Amino acid sequence: MFHYPDFFKVGISEAGNHDNREYEDDWAEKWQGLLKTNSDGTTNYDNQANQLVAKNLKGHLLLAHGTMDNNVPPYNTLLVVNELIKANKDFDLLLLPNRNHGFGNEAYMVRRRWDYFVRYLLGAEPPAGYELKPPPGGGRGGFAPPQ
């Protein structure tokens, strides 16, 4: 959404790793090599640093993060939030208390994701407070209970 703002109209980032410099070194170095600073001050990691291009946002963006995420810490998303605010961009932020990295299958997050796309892609208002329930006969139906 930041690199192709005229193409992407709606996006959702859940527990996003927005800058490999703020993540585990072994992951970043595996895919981008050792951090190198160029003579112009840019680095080989800049192309993966969303906060550097957040000002380009044009569409609707929902950022979601678990407050107890110990894989990709919430400050990774807050880097982008800070730059969106500086650029006076509208966006939506959902912080899920006491959730770790794997909240994406929780019924609430699934509903919020669906609602966001219905609202901003379909242009319709989703049913208010729709509750995803397990299928008859038990089971979770693929949805995780709240943590």
Task: List PLM regions with ranges.
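Active-site-proximal cap/loop segments of hydrolase catalytic domains
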Residues: 1-147
